[in-house]
């Protein structure tokens, strides 16, 4: 069976009881092959695939290799909070496709997306373990964080999972969450979590977010037509339209890396896959009485027609907050200073 998510094809493909020759992507338990053998599984939403997630997944991969079996990362779509609390939409640190890419870079064999439906939400912990982990995935070991919960009303925890493992013959390894001194406040110790990173992004603290992620926070989107004002002012910008509910940094101007993610030809000097220095404005353009919140990237030292391109903006540092200027000339001068500042930061 073959399906797709996020524009990427998924296929069950052949399976073995050893590590697989290539990464497989499955959606739903129906795509788990009927002859699937034993495996190591780690479970979580993994939004952001931050350093805590990376340590968990790396440990699962190492365990799978030592046991000579594939490693499966099981995640969920949509975010469980959207189903448990209808109307809620946690800001998304990574798209599902980006999540898969980041997870696969860590050496896993299978990326399994379980549709988080109202029926799935109602699974008791006992059914969750028996029907999914034991009967379908044939787990030999489950690797989770120490705060892991599962099943209806999150009634299952690590202790219950261990008891189930004793009954069904699989091991459970729970890992301590990562805590470090804050990158921006040396007097504060923080525990890396998706919630913490969302709060950093929301506050515009992209340095702290990057410290927890292990890389700059990325916003992806398609370049759409704006009002063309940047070009008139001498700073033509790519207006990036991210997916709904993306985690967008606080209003302000940022130094960032800009990358076109597609592979087709582009009219101009921008090469797909190459990253370019950029000064990025997030906000409503108050100088011109704007109301719509936008992400506008001025890509340094390039000329290109980017309309319709799928791009990524990796936020490195906040240069200043959003300001309203009385004169357009004052804005233009500040944009020049922002560009110089971004270039200096990104050239280090």
Task: For the regions a language model picked out, list residue spans one by one.
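N-terminal Rossmann-like or analogous alpha/beta NTP/dinucleotide-binding catalytic cores
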Residues: 82-168
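Residue-level signal for inorganic ion chemistry
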Residues: 50, 103, 142, 209, ...
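Phosphate/ribose-recognition catalytic cores of enzymes acting on nucleotide-derived substrates
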Residues: 2-3, 9, 15, 226-348
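Glycine-rich, Lys/Arg-enriched anion-binding loops that position phosphate/diphosphate groups
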Residues: 165-281
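Positively charged, low-complexity intrinsically disordered leader regions
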Residues: 2-40
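General small-molecule cofactor/ligand-binding pocket signal
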Residues: 24-26, 111-113, 171-175
């Amino acid at each position: 069976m073959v399906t797709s998510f996020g524009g990427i094809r998924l296929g069950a493909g052949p399976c073995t009881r050893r590590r697989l020759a290539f990464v497989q992507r499955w959606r739903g338990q129906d795509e788990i092959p009927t002859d699937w053998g034993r495996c190591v599984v780690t479970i979580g939403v993994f939004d952001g695939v931050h350093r805590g997630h990376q340590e968990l997944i790396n440990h699962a991969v190492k365990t799978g290799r030592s046991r000579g079996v594939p490693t499966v990362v099981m995640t969920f779509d949509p975010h469980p909070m959207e189903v448990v609390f209808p109307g809620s939409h946690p800001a998304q640190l990574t798209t599902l496709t980006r999540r898969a890419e980041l997870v696969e870079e860590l050496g896993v064999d299978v990326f399994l997306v379980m549709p988080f439906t109202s029926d799935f939400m109602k699974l008791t912990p006992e059914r969750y373990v028996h029907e999914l982990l034991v009967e379908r995935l044939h787990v030999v070991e489950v690797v989770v964080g120490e705060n892991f919960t599962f099943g209806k009303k999150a009634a299952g925890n690590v202790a219950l999972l261990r008891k189930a493992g004793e009954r069904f013959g699989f091991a459970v390894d729970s890992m301590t969450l990562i805590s470090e001194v804050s990158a921006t406040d040396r007097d504060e110790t923080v525990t890396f979590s998706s919630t913490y990173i969302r709060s950093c992004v929301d506050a515009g603290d992209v340095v702290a977010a990057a410290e927890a992620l292990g890389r700059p926070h990325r916003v992806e989107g398609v370049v759409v037509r704006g009002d063309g004002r940047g070009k008139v002012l001498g700073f033509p910008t790519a207006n990036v339209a991210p997916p709904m509910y993306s985690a967008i940094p606080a209003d302000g101007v940022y130094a960032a890396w800009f990358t076109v993610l597609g592979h087709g030809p582009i009219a101009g000097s921008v090469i797909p896959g190459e990253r370019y220095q950029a000064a990025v404005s997030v906000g409503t353009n108050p100088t011109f009485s704007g109301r719509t919140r936008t992400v506008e990237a001025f890509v340094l030292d390039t000329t290109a027609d980017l309309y319709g391109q799928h791009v990524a903006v990796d936020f490195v540092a906040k240069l200043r907050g959003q300001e309203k200027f009385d004169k357009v000339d004052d804005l233009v001068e500040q944009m020049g200073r922002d560009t110089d500042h971004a270039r200096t930061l990104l050239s280090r």
